[in-house]
From Swiss-Prot:
Protein name: D-alanine--D-alanine ligase
Cited InterPro entries: ATP-grasp, ATP_grasp_subdomain_1, D-Ala_lig_Van_CS, D_ala_D_ala, Dala_Dala_lig_C, Dala_Dala_lig_N, PreATP-grasp_dom_sf
PROSITE patterns: ATP_GRASP, DALA_DALA_LIGASE_1, DALA_DALA_LIGASE_2
GO biological process, one term: peptidoglycan biosynthetic process
GO CC aspect terms: cytoplasm
Catalyzed reaction equations: 2 D-alanine + ATP = D-alanyl-D-alanine + ADP + phosphate + H(+)
Keywords: ATP-binding, Cell shape, Cell wall biogenesis/degradation, Cytoplasm, Ligase, Magnesium, Manganese, Metal-binding, Nucleotide-binding, Peptidoglycan synthesis
Cofactor note: Binds 2 magnesium or manganese ions per subunit.
Record: residues binding Mg(2+) 1: D284, E296
Listed pathway(s): Cell wall biogenesis; peptidoglycan biosynthesis
Length: 345
């Protein structure tokens, strides 16, 4: 498959994206083209042979060709003119801001570059935890009750604990804390506000089952991963969730009844359908007393959750060949001519 992996970004999850891209290269050794977005949002063409963490941490990437966008692709300037990066489809692998919030999707759609990843509306909705709650409700998928806290507003949250506190627009469990009393809540909010102007508070459900399910729709048919039950102490913190995702070995399937598995897949379809076409996403669910609750939609999971799939390369290739088509618009200026004639100009 002729893909170009776009990774990095001006994001708190910048380094996670680098690790994700390096891990994906191990799974798909045929990948040749990588496009790195640094903290200044400059694009660099990175050959597969230079995909090492040191290359980015030490700033060596700045010696690579800098890229710019034109309709249809990424280009580098050379001695004999411009050279296009030779790929058919881009793969959005930027976690957090720039990749999951719709910025990169906007650029790729504007320049008519085919890509795997969430489209603009799906990105904006899934990146904001409050919008995700509203979307899930509209789709008939339950979520836990919640409160919103804003940085400069007075805080009145009652006395029901424990609570889990999350920055409103951030992933990878960065800035997430559990508060068991008012003092811990104040501290947790201060931590969350280091990363965002708003935070989402939910009841922390001790002992609730959590399951992760990844998938995509190709030619009208859903392709699901195995269902994972993450191993955790209290909650999936940054170290457990993302320093561990670079693993490449396959996981054992969660011990679930057929009925529970069906409920999870039905909820996934409700969330994916007519919103996430062209992307491979992972939905994280809670299950309690045979009730399914959405925890979060991860529109660009770490290393695209390859470790959850039996035949990840085949699924990715099929997805690349069955992307949503943009509706063409014909511009012929006939209305301008009519208006000018009516005005006598």
């Amino acid at each position: 498959m002729n893909l170009a992996v776009i990774f990095g970004g001006a994001s708190y999850e910048h380094e996670i994206s680098i690790v994700s891209a390096i891990s994906l290269k191990k799974i798909l050794p045929a990948l040749e083209h990588f496009i790195f977005v640094d903290g200044n949002r400059d694009f660099y063409w990175i050959p597969a042979s230079e995909m090492r963490s040191k290359h980015f941490a030490d700033g060596i990437y700045k010696k690579n060709p800098k890229l710019f966008l034109r309709p249809g692709g990424f280009y580098a300037k050379g001695l004999w003119g411009e050279k296009r990066v030779p790929f058919d489809t881009a793969l959005n692998l930027i976690h957090g801001g720039d990749g999951e919030d719709g910025k990169l999707a906007s650029l790729l759609e504007f320049f008519r570059i085919p890509f795997i990843g969430p489209r603009i509306e799906a990105s904006v909705m899934s990146f904001n935890k409050h919008l995700t709650k509203l979307y899930a409700k509209e789709r008939g998928v339950k979520t836990l009750p919640y409160l919103l806290a804003r940085k400069n507003e007075k805080r009145e949250f009652g006395n029901e604990f424990p609570l889990i506190v999350k920055p409103l627009r951030l992933g990878s469990s960065i800035g997430v804390s559990i508060a068991k009393n008012r003092q811990e809540l104040d501290y947790a909010l201060d931590v969350a506000f280091e990363f965002d102007e708003a935070a989402l508070l939910e009841p922390f459900m001790q002992g609730i089952k959590e399951y992760n399910l990844a998938g995509c729709k190709i030619n009208g048919e859903y392709h699901f991963s195995i269902i994972e039950e993450p191993q955790k102490k209290e909650f999936l913190d940054f170290d457990k969730k993302y320093l561990d995702f670079s693993r490449t070995q396959k996981l054992l399937k969660a011990d679930l009844s057929e009925a529970s598995e069906r409920l999870l897949k039905e909820a996934f379809i409700k969330l994916y359908d007519d919103s996430f076409e062209g992307s491979l996403i992972r939905c994280d669910f809670f299950v309690q007393n045979q009730e399914v609750f959405l925890n979060e939609i991860n529109p660009i999971p770490g290393s695209l959750a390859n470790y959850l799939f039996e035949d990840f390369p085949k699924i990715l290739q099929s997805l690349a060949h069955n992307l949503p088509k943009e509706r063409g618009i014909k511009i012929d200026y006939r209305y301008i001519h009519q208006i000018q004639k009516a005005k006598g100009k």
